[in-house]
Amino acid sequence: MAKRTKKVGIVGKYGTRYGASLRKMVKKMEITQHSKYTCSFCGKDSMKRAVVGIWSCKRCKRTVAGGAWVYSTTAAASVRSAVRRLRETKEQ
């Protein structure tokens, strides 16, 4: 592995290539895609990205579809709230 500095972090592997602004954008994406998320089924911090859009929990072995870079997207959250609201109006 290439040596990374404190300032550039995970994108230190690119060295001086591609420009600073592009490396900053890639840094944000790579940090979110490699981090662990809280599993919505077991509640542990063990949800990891398997491939693009597929997230699997190491503890309870559940696999779910999510965002490409993050586990839960803002669009998914708005759809979830809309479905919940429609269910509540249907029950009443």
Curated annotation (Swiss-Prot):
Question: What family does the database annotate?
Answer: Belongs to the eukaryotic ribosomal protein eL43 family.
Q: Which organism is it from?
A: Drosophila melanogaster (Fruit fly)
* Regions that span the bilayer: none
GO cellular component terms, alphabetically, are: cytosolic large ribosomal subunit; cytosolic ribosome
Recite the UniProt keywords alphabetically.
Metal-binding, Ribonucleoprotein, Ribosomal protein, Zinc, Zinc-finger
Pfam families found in the cross-reference section: Ribosomal_L37ae
Mark the C4-type zinc finger spans by residue number. Answer: 39-60
Name this protein carries in UniProt: Large ribosomal subunit protein eL43
| Taxonomy, superkingdom | Eukaryota
What GO biological process term is on the record, naming one? cytoplasmic translation
Q: Which NCBIfam families match?
A: eL43_euk_arch, PRK03976.1
**Which InterPro entries does the annotation name?**
Ribosomal_eL37/eL43, Ribosomal_eL43, Ribosomal_protein_eL43, Ribosomal_zn-bd
List GO molecular-function terms, semicolon-separated.
Answer: structural constituent of ribosome; zinc ion binding
Q: Quote the Gene3D superfamilies the UniProt record gives.
A: 2.20.25.30
